[in-house]
Amino acid sequence: MKDNQPILEVDRIIHEPARLLIVTILYTAEKADFLFLLNETGLTRGNLSTHLTKLEAAGYVNIEKSFRGKIPQTLCSLTSSGQEAFEKYRKQINQFLKRT
């Protein structure tokens, strides 16, 4: 390893622990509503919303808002870019762990 080089260059959007948890859930579940993510992550509504917004801005998450009767529903899923980014992240982490 050269001086001044980071040990591991990974996608910082995904690497943040709360977003990593969200992306992992969406990768395995394909789609999840906001309340499911809220319960599974243990985040507050505001934190979950903020992290989903960052993932959406990066093009990793698709957020669909609709109504079921009069009840609002927010459905989240990974985009193909999000799936690819998560798979790349996993590969990088696995390769790094094999080196240590």
Located regions from the model:
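Residues within the DNA-recognition helix of helix-turn-helix
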Residues: 51
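Amphipathic alpha-helical dimerization/coiled-coil segments
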Residues: 2-7, 24-25, 83-100
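Short beta-strand "wing" residues that participate in macromolecule-binding interfaces
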Residues: 63
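N-terminal helix-turn-helix DNA-binding core of bacterial DNA-binding proteins
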Residues: 6-47, 66-77
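Glycine-centered, phosphate/nucleic-acid-interacting loop/turn motifs that mediate DNA/RNA or nucleotide
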Residues: 59
